Design a protein with these regions (language model features):
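WD40 beta-propeller repeat fold
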Residues: 1-181, 187, 191-208, 215-217, ...
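Hydrophobic pocket-lining "lid/loop/helix" segments that shape and contact the acyl-thioester
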Residues: 229-231
Length: 331
């Protein structure tokens, strides 16, 4: 099934890297972007608003380096953080002009992922090409925890939606790891899963069955892992319960639906975004069918990096692409 384009907007001169809906306002969307495809030059944070007929830019904030990711605050409806190519993290208040409210510089390489804790709303996590994951709180000028998570680039770090102290990470080393942030030393993972034979670029926790984690890889697959199948004593290779095939090139992002336990979306370098049904993880279905592709959005003309489900309107997705376009669409 092809997608239905609902609204679109352009971000001229900037490649879209990440997008996120506000957890407070149904009609507000933020985009992290970079000039020159993120290779050199500045970045821009775009705040977009949508109504029944249009998607328009409300405000923009410029940064000195590319912006690769963002996360809305869970405690302040007008604030969000961005991660940059120079290793900096900035906290912005969209009711103010130009300058960030707070800035941190501890990472020594690109910050590629930011995730605000949905349960402990005072903190957020960052992951970087410097192999580290850091946890922050806006009230402090330095990080409150540093985890040497992998021996190579950490593409994503995301908090569990059911445990404030549990974090998952994925890396160019092909592994998916989980961490208990209460445990010392923080260099020891709770679980280590051999997720893919290639780099793992993205992960997401299922919001309804939180023992399931989806990963997306350079190997063109999305894999779904059941953490209950993993043991704490060794590298696990038997946690994968489903592999989703269909993308033609590397998959940049994966996200479970916030409204349907058995649906997830993915996007990547084949210029498409896809929605999948994974009915076997929905316990109410007595005779689940195999996982299946249920829709494709193929209207972008460049790599699709940003992907977000609407938190208020079931089935509505946003994508941000290197074609300098933001699309809102549904199946």
């Amino acid at each position: 099934m092809n997608s239905k384009l609902q609204r679109q907007s352009s971000i001229p001169g900037f490649a879209g890297y990440s997008c996120a809906y506000s957890p407070f306002y149904p009609n507000r969307l933020a985009i992290a972007s970079a000039a020159n495809f993120g290779l050199v030059g500045n970045g821009r944070l775009h705040i977009l608003t949508t109504d029944a007929h249009s998607l328009s830019t409300e405000k923009t904030f410029d940064s000195q380096d590319a912006l690769y990711d963002l996360a809305w605050s869970e405690i302040h409806e007008n604030q969000l953080v961005t991660g940059s190519g120079d290793g900096s993290i900035k906290l912005w208040d969209i009711m103010l002009n130009e300058l960030p409210v707070q800035s941190w510089l501890e990472h020594t390489r690109e910050v590629f992922c930011l995730d605000w804790n949905n349960l402990n709303k005072l903190c957020f996590a960052s992951s970087s090409w410097d192999h580290l994951v850091k946890i922050w709180t806006p009230s402090r000028s330095e990080s409150i925890m540093t985890i040497p998570a992998h021996d190579s680039c950490v593409y994503a770090a995301r908090f569990s939606p059911s445990s404030a102290d549990t974090l998952a990470t994925c890396s160019s080393d092909g592994t998916l790891k989980t961490w208990d942030t209460r445990t010392k030393p923080t260099s020891r993972a709770s679980l280590v899963i051999a997720a893919h034979p290639n780099e793992v670029l993205s992960l997401d926790w299922n919001k309804y069955a939180t023992h399931y984690v989806a990963t997306a890889s350079v190997d063109r697959t999305v894999k779904i892992h059941d953490l209950r199948h993993a043991t704490t004593t060794s590298l696990n290779s038997n946690a994968c319960v489903e592999t989703l095939l269909g993308h033609q090139y590397a998959i940049r992002n994966v996200a479970w639906s916030p409204h349907a336990a058995d649906q997830l979306a993915s996007c990547g370098y084949d210029m498409t975004a896809r929605v999948w049904a994974v009915p076997q993880i929905a316990p109410k279905l007595p005779h689940p069918h195999p996982a299946a592709l249920i829709g494709i959005h193929h209207l972008h003309k460049e790599f699709v990096f940003g992907l977000a489900w609407s938190l208020f309107q079931p089935g509505l997705l946003a994508t941000a692409s290197w074609d300098q376009q933001v699309h809102l669409w549904s199946l």
